[in-house]
Design a protein with these regions (language model features):
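Glycine-rich phosphate- or other oxyanion-binding loops that anchor nucleotides, phosphorylated ligands
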Residues: 1-99, 107-114, 118, 124-132, ...
């Protein structure tokens, strides 16, 4: 952002998700006895649409554990804004080429019938309930670490104490 003011930012996406927030989410899930997998590789495709069988196969070959359309660009915008960000990905379909067909209605019905929606809501509520802002992560400074050029005058005026 800030491109027309001779400043742009390239945020480091090495650790895109906040590890501290992820730990809090994992602790909340554990306290509720809701199993979660701590780490996975998410491949984002352009949506809203389902991936083709060839895309699913390609992402598998590249090492993806999950494929979907959410998370990007949200994670990038959160990094640029200096926000802690994490995601809970509920598996709702196996993907084209892994099952005979994929339909949005089937996916939505499964999400509700298997209890995923309620589980995600419980985890989010518990994370908020037990949240303490004790962050020592680098999320807040992510954008500042990637600055090239000069900040525009309006930005400096808005951020002065």
């Amino acid at each position: 952002f800030f491109e027309k003011e001779s400043c742009w930012v390239r945020v480091d996406m090495t650790d895109a998700f906040c590890s501290q927030l992820r730990k809090k989410i994992m602790a909340s899930a554990a306290s509720l006895q809701i199993p979660l997998i701590d780490h996975a590789v998410f491949a984002c495709s352009e949506g809203p649409r389902f991936e083709s069988a060839a895309e699913v196969k390609m992402y598998q070959m590249l090492g993806a554990d999950l494929v979907g359309t959410p998370v990007v660009p949200e994670i990038i915008l959160a990094r640029e804004a200096g926000m802690c960000y994490s995601a809970i990905a509920a598996i709702m379909n196996l993907g084209c080429g892994m099952v005979e067909s994929v339909a949005h209605d089937d996916m939505t019905k499964y999400y509700r019938s298997c209890g995923a929606q309620e589980k995600v809501e419980k985890i989010v509520r518990e994370t908020i309930r037990t949240f303490v802002d004790d962050r020592t992560c680098r999320c807040a400074g992510a954008a500042l670490e990637g600055v090239a050029g000069r900040f525009p005058a309006w930005y400096l005026e808005e951020t002065e104490p």
